[in-house]
Design a protein with these regions (language model features):
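Short, Lys/Arg-rich, polar N-terminal cytosolic tail immediately upstream
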Residues: 1-17
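Hydrophobic transmembrane alpha-helices
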Residues: 20-74, 80-81
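Structural signature of hydrophobic alpha-helical transmembrane segments
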Residues: 38-50, 80-94, 186-195
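Membrane-interface helix-loop-helix junctions at boundaries between adjacent transmembrane segments
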Residues: 51, 59, 72-146
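Generic multipass alpha-helical transmembrane bundles of integral membrane proteins
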Residues: 120-121, 129-240
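Alpha-helical membrane-embedded segments
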Residues: 146-151, 225-230, 247-266
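Juxtamembrane/interface segments at transmembrane-helix termini
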Residues: 162, 209-210, 240-244, 260-277
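Short, highly charged, low-complexity non-transmembrane loops/tails of multi-pass membrane proteins
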Residues: 268-292
């Protein structure tokens, strides 16, 4: 354990010295993954889906605030949707506008949360998000997480319905537009995932803030258990087809990531816990002191 603590101290010193470069590298990798995922799934406009465009956007967004990357990703999605169907692009603009209003109202300055949520779902590890957000954030982080889930499913819907939306006739376009709008608004799988994410974030955050030993580990396991149980119940009672491999593997990975986060952000020695009692003129105080 002592050797791990030494490595943690070394890592923290290294990060303190080179944090600017580390963050920019991570921002570039996030942009590369994000724009690459969008272009590989809905690359209807060939110019915008090229490797040069993907890399160029990632490089440009590396040196700008993360909110710019969020807008760039939304713009790239809309461009691809427009290349497929203008009505779909207009509906998407309205949905993105509504999500931005909610984001700006509840979590300004946290645009990276939306991006991470989209990436996690795109990489088929959705249930890492509730554990990470519940441990590091507050219940308000449900808003950007939900926006990320909706954004991912919008891309997935269009990818799956591309052939219908490519119809040249007016009737085909109208039918495709109605189908897309219905999928976004009434998709049971999407809203189930939003609900799972919200409930799990609340559970993880509630457990993490309790004054119990190993609260972070318990919170991670509790959040993963909630994800597995609710997702399995959704498959059973709503007749959904969420992959059980994705459910289990992403939940297990969420627990593993939670343990790593605890090591770096909340590493304490529970074996040396002390319970202290003292008083003043008005109150008795019972304090549980856990050394770092």
């Amino acid at each position: 354990m002592s050797s791990l603590l030494v490595w943690r101290e070394k890592f923290q010193r290294f990060y303190a010295n080179y944090s600017v470069y580390i963050l920019k590298i991570l921002q570039f990798l996030m942009g590369l993954l994000l724009f690459g995922m969008i272009n590989s799934n809905i690359g209807f406009m060939k110019t915008a889906s090229s490797v040069f465009c993907t890399a160029g956007l990632a490089v440009i967004c590396t040196f700008l605030p993360l909110i710019v990357m969020t807008f760039a990703a939304a713009a790239l999605v809309i461009v691809h949707f427009y290349a497929l169907s203008m009505p779909i692009a207009l509906v998407s603009v309205l949905i993105f506008l509504l999500m931005y209003i909610f984001y700006f109202r509840f979590t300004p300055g946290k645009s990276w949360l939306v991006l991470v949520s989209v990436l996690a779902f795109g990489l088929k590890i959705p249930f890492v998000i509730p554990v990470v957000f519940g441990l590091l954030g507050t219940p308000v982080w449900i808003v950007p997480a939900g926006c990320g889930v909706i954004g991912y499913y919008m891309i997935d819907f269009v990818k799956g319905s591309a052939s219908a939306l490519k119809a040249s006739g007016t009737d085909g376009l109208a039918q495709g537009l109605l189908s897309f709008t219905k999928q976004v608004m009434t998709s049971r799988e999407m809203w189930l995932m939003v609900m799972i994410t919200a409930i799990a974030i609340l559970v993880v955050n509630a457990v993490r803030t309790r004054a119990v030993d190993h609260a972070w580990k318990i919170a991670s396991v509790a959040g993963a258990a909630v994800c597995i149980v609710v997702a399995a119940a959704g498959n059973l009672f709503l007749d959904e087809q969420i992959s059980y491999a994705v459910i289990i593997l992403s939940s297990v990975l969420g627990v593993a990531v939670g343990i790593v986060l605890e090591f770096f952000f909340f590493s304490v020695d529970y074996s040396r816990t002390e319970n202290v009692q003292f008083e003043d003129d008005e109150y008795y105080y019972y304090v549980k002191a856990v050394p770092k």
